[in-house]
């Protein structure tokens, strides 16, 4: 069974085009009839806003902290499925304090890999436990 390619957009600096690139890739891949999931790992939530996802419902914070599953948090938008983020994600750093915490995202993404062609991860402009989780889970890194 084919598995999704996970692509992470990352850079320690803000304003370099990470979110814009994720939005563009969503459009390109979906125009080629590819199934895409975009995950906003930045507490600022710019990807969520740009893709028209609600930042008031269940978010990646709820998934990472075990309050819900990815299936509960996925929202369908025009070009792709989205797991939104909001400022609450900032608190995840404090909640993720167990051994193996850098593998949480990878483990939670595994069941989704057979349902998508691409999973795109938009990271915050900092080296945090969320960014490390993205690095562990990813197949390819793009550093704009």
Enumerate the language-model features and the residues they cover.
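P-loop NTP-binding core
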Residues: 1-144
């Amino acid at each position: 069974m084919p598995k999704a390619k996970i692509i992470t957009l990352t850079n320690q600096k803000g304003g370099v085009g990470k979110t814009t690139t994720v939005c563009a890739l969503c459009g390109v891949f979906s125009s080629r009839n590819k199934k895409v999931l975009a995950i906003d790992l930045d507490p600022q939530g710019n990807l969520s806003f740009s893709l028209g996802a609600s930042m008031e419902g269940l978010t990646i914070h709820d998934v990472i902290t075990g309050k819900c599953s990815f299936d509960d948090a996925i929202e369908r938008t025009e070009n792709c499925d989205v797991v939104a983020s909001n400022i609450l994600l900032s608190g995840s750093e404090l909640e993720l304090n167990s051994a193996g915490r850098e593998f949480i995202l990878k483990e939670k993404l595994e069941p989704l890999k057979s349902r998508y062609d691409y999973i795109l991860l938009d990271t915050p402009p900092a080296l945090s436990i969320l960014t490390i989780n993205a690095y562990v889970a990813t197949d390819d890194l793009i550093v704009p």
